[in-house]
Amino acid sequence: RKNHPNTILNTTDVRLLKDQDIPSCDGVIGGPPCQAWSEGGKQLGFEDPRGQLFLEYVRIVNLKKPKFFVIENVQGILEDKHKQSLAFIISSLQSIGYSIKYELLNAADYKIPQDRFRVFFVGIRNDLQNTFVFPNAMPGKKVTLREAIGDIIEKPRFFNEERVMSEHSTRKNHDVYTGSYDAKYMARNRVRSWNEQSFTIQAQARNEPQH
């Protein structure tokens, strides 16, 4: 809201939205909640109420009949345990008049300095008789952290005196030992080489990597 103060933002529960609540549009772009499909969760799929919101996306597309739509979600949705759910989602979108293509892409292959694997579903309305083709990975080397943020001036770090680490820590496999740290299998304060891409940046403001 602060970055785009003139944007019309409708925060109504998507399950309550009616046709007249949504303006006509050429395309619908969005990402149904990922928690039900994420490898970091219980992966309950449609058994999770958040997973059922995928069907609300289908409903909205059916209401507005845009020329195209784009759905983004986590790669966990491609796992075998969700095979039937994925087939149902695709058949539901096809049944309302769309040709569907989907593919797992990594943002790092498109000049983004971040390893971020996501599944993209693209639907084109059948009457348009157009075929969508996913772009190939961009040529050349990937953009590194050094190229993206290497010019940022480092600020002094302030340490929490109550969380000083013992010289004989029983916790091993740490990427970094300064400030609030965590094991390398978690996300907090992890550090990637300046010549690599960042870990996947999370939406929440906790467990974030340093870079």
Predicted regions mapped to residue ranges:
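Short alpha-helical segments and helix-capping/turn motifs at coil-helix boundaries
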Residues: 14, 104-108, 184-187
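Conserved beta-strand scaffold positions in the cores of enzyme catalytic domains, especially
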Residues: 9, 100-104, 200
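Extracellular/periplasmic catalytic domains that process cell-envelope and extracellular macromolecules
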Residues: 2, 21, 113-115, 192-195
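Short catalytic/ligand-binding loop motif for oxyanion handling, primarily in non-cytosolic enzymes
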Residues: 35-39, 77-80, 111-115, 128-131, ...
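Core alpha/beta nucleotide-donor-binding catalytic domains of modification enzymes
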Residues: 1-65, 75-79, 84-87
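Conserved Class I SAM-dependent methyltransferase catalytic core
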Residues: 52-115, 119-124
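S-adenosyl-L-methionine-dependent DNA methyltransferase catalytic core
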Residues: 92-95, 118-211
